[in-house]
Design a protein with these regions (language model features):
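Active-site neighborhood of glycoside hydrolase catalytic domains
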Residues: 392-394, 426-428, 432-587, 601, ...
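C-terminal beta-sandwich/jelly-roll accessory domains of carbohydrate-active enzymes
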Residues: 670-740
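Glycine-rich, aromatic-flanked loop segments that form ligand/cofactor-binding clefts
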Residues: 71-117, 242-257, 299-324, 361-368, ...
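Conserved, mostly hydrophobic/aromatic
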Residues: 18, 164, 288, 334, ...
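Polysaccharide-binding surfaces and accessory modules of carbohydrate-active proteins
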Residues: 5, 10-13, 21, 31-263, ...
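Aromatic-lined carbohydrate-binding/catalytic grooves of carbohydrate-active enzymes
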Residues: 325-461, 475
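Carbohydrate-binding surface patches
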Residues: 242, 644-686
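Short Pro-Gly-centered flexible turn/kink motifs
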Residues: 100-105, 283-302, 730-737
């Protein structure tokens, strides 16, 4: 790993064992991009990679020079209105109404380590020798403002992180109308864009489409990263698949409004931009003030989509997630929501806890309905004091009774919301994130609190901190069950309104930081009606997230497959729920439900008191299996083998770091009849190591399992083999593979 600056050619070469990123200060003193991709052998001069020539009708930067036009030059952080007609990385408005600025290279710093981003989540290092950072300082002296481009390259990962800081040192105020986290200009357009799209209960489905001229974008203007689009995109060569080919991955460490887009110009170059969505964003800076953008993480892979994903997984699991629970195995839980919804009292809860303890579970989570007068979704959000009548005593007493059964105690909260039927709203109607006197949209009969306001955060924070200090809570599920609509901060001026959406999410981060710092032993799980805020920003504070409110095992195949494009198994919340399923009404075997849920944090969300002895015995087996395998599942290398978006079958596997153990999950949705013989080719094993595969009466070397594959044929397909139980539709099987 190194960052080398050549003063003569004014080039920066950022490289490690796998990647290179080369920047050049151009003739106009602005930074241009020469190369990003597979590692290049370092040399002193790469300036021949910079190409420019006359193009008819282009605007040219220098008098008497008809060759240098920003319209067809690859740039690091392109501005608005200076000859580049593509979408800019930032736009500034001056007091005189001008949007024309010219930031040029002033100086730079190269140092070991990685700086923290004030008030924002970001990847980190545990020692300075893990990474090097370049701070590239640009200045427009005419407006007394600097832009600092931050680049960090890791030693152990094919990763570069980027963010931008604006610093104003002028008596003139400037207003940021747009401030993206990074821009990447690529030489050609021969890529396919991959993104993760969906809606409630159908999150992060994989989409892949060829780049074309113009702009293709994904975004959120909902106040959270959203179900609709995850803050991630990848550009893959057309021949790239899960196992081979060139892939660029881009992920934004942010939980609010975002924009991620590709733009192909008529010279066939592709531009990637990612950052805070400019719609509704307007940030004014006065003298001595600064603005920091969120971090964008860039991953390069020569080993296809699995290679990209494995880098994201390890980076996010070990250098984004933090705290006590980063490396600890996660407890097997029972959640009360789909067991009782709002219809519970203390005897019901204690009965469920008895059943959970008897089956070997470790954590009891009391979901919605324990506070205020909360017997349905119409009241009491914001009134974070226990309903002692409903609980037949204090919450502390209930938690201690559950602890006495050998279970940890967890709690559901939704700090950012209120109902009109609540003590909070009656006392502070001006705390809603909406203009008083105007019609306000409701969703789930609730409303958003203005977390841009310090007094709101402190009020909610004090209530929750006092609660957690009193009650022996080991787990918190932090929910957010609606998105923004009418955004307005009461009592603040016009200039403030353009800052509200970003200040809101900074406020959420602040409260997360307060609570996780005060209670480091508590495991936090993020949630937003399922997966509406399942993003890297949340992972910085909560090492696991509720992946989707859809707990149906068959629907979860696509949801968890897509989620794994970016996020490690250790953060994917997954539960075994009731059959028929509460979202789809689908009936599936309890074995299948567990075989899907194993590949996540794992838990149960159903009424255990209604189970028969056969199901209870199966759950005991499942829990014993998970306790034995969860260290491998949480920390192993994950491979996607067969996509649910391409056929009737899904498969994935996890391999231990030493390649001595693996688990393979195989799923078939519908039972075919009289089809051909099936093989599943594995990955990540040692070719010359002999392995025992569960369900087979013979051993196989790794090369056979990877080149020929496991036999998956069953009796309904015309031949019996021991690998797969014949279950008909919704078949699943988890294979254990162990080195002999």
């Amino acid at each position: 790993m190194s960052i080398i600056y050549n003063e003569k050619t004014r080039e920066f070469h950022l490289y490690n064992q796998e990647i290179s990123y080369i920047i050049k200060i151009l003739d106009n003193d602005q930074p241009g991009q020469l190369y990003y991709g597979k590692r290049l052998t370092h040399k002193e001069d790469f300036s021949h990679l910079f190409e420019y020539a006359m193009r008819d009708m282009s605007p040219y930067a220098f008098e008497g020079n008809s060759t240098f036009s920003l319209e067809n030059i690859k740039q690091e952080y392109p501005t608005f209105g200076c000859g580049d007609m593509r979408f800019p990385a930032y736009e500034i408005e001056r007091e005189n109404g001008s949007h024309v600025v010219e930031f040029v290279y002033k100086e730079h710093k190269i140092y070991n380590g990685k700086p923290k981003l004030e008030g924002l989540p970001a990847t980190y290092v545990e020692s300075d020798d893990e990474a090097q950072t370049l701070e590239l300082v640009l200045e427009d002296a005419s407006i007394g403002t600097k832009i600092i481009l931050l680049y960090t390259i890791y030693e152990a990962f094919p990763v570069i992180t980027r963010s931008v800081r604006f610093e104003c040192d002028s008596d003139e105020k400037i207003t940021l109308l747009s401030a993206m986290s990074a821009c990447v200009d690529l030489l050609d357009k021969d890529y396919e864009m991959i993104d993760l799209a969906g809606v409630w209960a159908r999150e992060r489905h994989v989409r892949r489409h060829k780049l074309d001229y113009g702009i293709q974008s994904i975004y959120s203007m909902r106040g959270c990263s959203s179900y609709q689009f995850n803050p991630f995109l990848a550009l893959a060569r057309e021949n790239a698949d899960e196992f081979q080919g060139q892939v660029y991955g881009f992920s934004l460490v942010y939980s609010g409004n975002f924009l991620a887009q590709t733009e192909v110009d008529n010279y066939d170059t592709a531009r990637v931009l990612m950052g805070i969505h400019p719609n509704g964003f307007k940030w004014t800076l006065g003298k001595g003030e600064a603005f920091q953008t969120p971090e964008m993480v860039m991953v390069y892979s020569e080993a296809g989509l699995n290679g990209m994903s494995q880098t994201f997984h390890k980076l996010y699991r070990t250098r984004l997630a933090r705290g006590t629970w980063r490396d600890k195995v996660r407890p097997i839980l029972i959640n009360s929501w789909e067991a009782f919804y709002f219809d519970f009292d203390a005897p019901k809860l204690l009965g469920l806890a008895d059943a959970a303890a008897d089956l070997g579970m470790e954590l009891f989570v009391l979901d919605d309905g324990w506070f205020g007068k909360r017997d349905d979704s119409t009241s009491s959000l914001g009134d974070w004091y226990p309903n002692e009548e409903k609980l037949k005593g204090t919450l502390k007493e209930l938690a201690e009774k559950i602890n006495a059964k050998g279970l940890k105690f967890g709690l559901w909260i939704e700090p950012e919301m209120t109902n009109k039927d609540s003590d909070l709203y009656r006392a502070h109607p001006d705390w809603l994130l909406a203009e008083q006197g105007k019609r306000i949209c409701h969703s789930r009969t609730q409303y958003v609190l203005d977390f841009s306001k310090k007094e709101v955060r402190e009020y909610i924070g004090d209530m929750l901190e006092n609660l957690l200090a009193e009650v022996p809570v080991s787990y918190i599920k932090w929910d957010m069950n609606r998105t923004f609509s009418e955004v307005f901060s009461n009592g603040n001026d016009r200039e403030y309104q353009g800052k509200v959406c970003h200040k809101y999410i900074l406020g959420v981060y602040e409260l997360y930081e307060r609570l996780t710092s005060r209670f480091p032993h508590v495991l936090f799980e993020s949630c937003a009606s399922g997966g509406a805020r399942f993003d890297p920003g949340m992972l910085y504070y909560a090492p696991q997230g509720w992946t989707s409110d859809d707990t149906d095992a068959i629907e979860r195949l696509k949801i968890q497959y897509g989620t794994s494009m970016v996020y490690p198994v250790s953060c994917i919340g997954s539960h075994v729920s009731a059959s028929p399923n509460h979202q789809t009404n689908r009936v599936t075997p309890i074995e299948t439900r567990a075989d899907v849920a194993y590949f996540g944090t794992f838990g149960y969300e159903l009424d255990l008191l209604k189970l028969g002895e056969e199901d209870k015995a199966e759950i005991r087996r499942q829990i014993a299996f998970m306790k034995e395998k969860r260290d491998l599942i949480q920390k192993g290398t994950f491979y996607r083998l067969k996509s649910p978006f391409e056929g009737n079958e899904t498969a994935w596997m996890i391999v231990s770091e030493d390649q001595k153990k693996a688990l393979v999950g195989y799923y078939r949705v519908m039972q075919p009849v009289n089809v051909g013989f099936k093989r599943l080719k594995l990955k990540g094993l040692k070719e010359d190591t002999c392995y025992k595969v569960s369900g087979y009466d013979y051993d196989c070397y790794g090369d056979e399992l990877m080149q020929v594959g496991m036999i998956l044929s069953d009796s309904a397909s015309g031949v019996w083999k021991k690998g797969v139980n014949d279950k008909g539709d919704f078949q699943a099987k988890v294979f254990e593979i162990v080195a002999v």
